Amino acid sequence: MTELTETLELKLVEPNAHKHRKLCETKQVYQDALEAAFNANCTTQSAANDVVVNYDLSGYAKNALKKYVPQLCGGSYDAKELHDDHPVRFTNEGPKLDHKPQNAIEWYVQIPHHDDYHLWLPATPNPEQREWLEALHAGDAKMGECRLFTRDGEWYFHIVATRDVEERETSSAATPIRVDIGEASLLTVCHRDESDSPTAPN
């Protein structure tokens, strides 16, 4: 078995005014918490927790921050400054995916806002990733970290998904070569003598 990883993209379908405001609130508070933890140079999850615990975010966003900030502060990223438009990260326990094939918009994603309040939003996926989404919904793939962000004025949600696939067997035997009719005709045409009669190639 081989483990494959894919980042699935869902575009959130025109959130109403209330949900749009809640998404904006989550994004702003997350950015504030991220900046505070980064400026405090939190190199451990415990140090990051001491900062982000004071912010009005879901536990899933706080847990993602506790993992992410130490990577920025001397870890794998070792960033010197912070970009002002980071995506909101969530650990995989919070977001949920639902599929209603009978609806015009089939896919719905649950995005945590606070610990006791979540937003369900309709979403349109990348058509080429439908098989992955169906596997994720059926439990045949695992959800990893999720990210909420805006692009060109639209809201998007990314889900990192992994699943196991069977390895294809490779044969050591010679692979037969097939020639289609068009190629066969081309070979015949290419090997004719001066009188236009077929001849064996040199």
Predicted regions and their residues:
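Nucleic-acid substrate recognition interfaces
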Residues: M1-N202
